[in-house]
């Protein structure tokens, strides 16, 4: 029973790490990265479809994304979706592919993005602490129901805290790495 609580908490904390990694992937660092387009959805035959399902996204140069639609008739729809997005760059349509040039980041933009990274990292740590609270509550319920002893409860609480500390440290490391990547010129 006690191990089930810890395993469930670990699994949920891992999901928080994965979610954070996805969010960080969407924050650009002045280099082309296919994950910048992960949140773009295109109206394709009346259905909102993720861009990566209707086109291949390649990186021919350090700051250029090349979007090649599988169906050439969707080119205008893709261009419309890219123009409507908040990427801050204009797509260039040459009739068969769309080129997106990722602009170089200004110092001010870098600092703003670093603040955003800190905020996202802080939110991930709050989520991990909420998971810890849920696990602690579950352990206390088991102790109240006499499923575990008071000593087992104390041990379980220490184990949950250790898992939480490890998860928070991992988030701090991820945040620091992303900040460093953003502030690199």
Curated annotation (Swiss-Prot):
Gene Ontology molecular function terms on file: ribosomal large subunit binding
InterPro entries: Ribosome_recyc_fac, Ribosome_recyc_fac_dom, RRF_sf
Compartments it resides in: Cytoplasm
GO cellular component, one term: cytoplasm
Assigned keywords, A-Z: Cytoplasm, Protein biosynthesis
Any one biological process term the GO annotation gives: translational termination
Entry-linked CDD domains: RRF (cd00520)
Pfam family, one: RRF
Protein biosynthesis is among the record's keywords: yes
Its job: Responsible for the release of ribosomes from messenger RNA at the termination of protein biosynthesis. May increase the efficiency of translation by recycling ribosomes from one round of translation to another.
Cross-referenced PANTHER family: MITOCHONDRIAL RIBOSOME RECYCLING FACTOR PSEUDO 1 (PTHR20982:SF3), RIBOSOME RECYCLING FACTOR (PTHR20982)
Family: Belongs to the RRF family.
Protein name in the entry: Ribosome-recycling factor
Organism lineage: Bacteria, Bacillati, Bacillota, Bacilli, Lactobacillales
